[in-house]
């Protein structure tokens, strides 16, 4: 009798487990179909949005060029109004690593398309939520309001003629609303502002290469070429910053960061450490021809410091609250 009860209990548990598995498979299949049915049209919508914002950017750049030419005070700012707790003289005499900037991340972003918003707030809510749903003013307006450090994402995007373009998008699939779709035009926007504000604190632009190792040597060649072409002598390259030093280990050991006074009206590009970092280093291991300085992740410094630290102008500390002792 006892054995019969045990056998019956096992069968019931087995039956229940099969039902649970069946419900899980059914639920996951339904979830997958819902996501798929929304994902495909959303990518199409995102592509159209990218083209719309590309055209918008062309018009905006034309507007800026006309405005700068017509009005000598257009986008001209007074740095003193953005400096708190110190005088302009104090800030200019400080070393670059002794001051803090107001900064924005994904500085080109202007929200989500309707389809992407549905996915992020609905089927993808557990993974994405509202963290990517925000809108910035244009980069020029941010600079006018005192932002002195911005972040741009660089995507290598294939073109119909077999070539490629560098575009500034958070995601070419889903997040394509950008005020700087054409990366070079976005750089031109920044350069026009610097031309109008030659006494500005040095601008810092963090560049994040998207696509992992797909952002390859030819993409970096194109990106560096843009930076040299657009900014010329205003661009603070590793070679310029290092001066007599051979590497940034020695540079940092001597606290050789230049004063803000010597960097007025200049711009520093920082390459955010990603999977393509080794590619960028390999193309110029002596840092003599690169346009961008390298910003290492703090975790990399801790794990692979000996290999990479000599290339690092600075370090990025994400989740800063966990590393208060390092700030």
Language model region names:
Residues 6-16, 20, 24-27, 31-327:
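Catalytic cores of phosphodiester-bond hydrolases, prominently lipid phosphodiesterases
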Residues 2-4:
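N-terminal acidic, proline/glycine-rich, low-complexity intrinsically disordered segments
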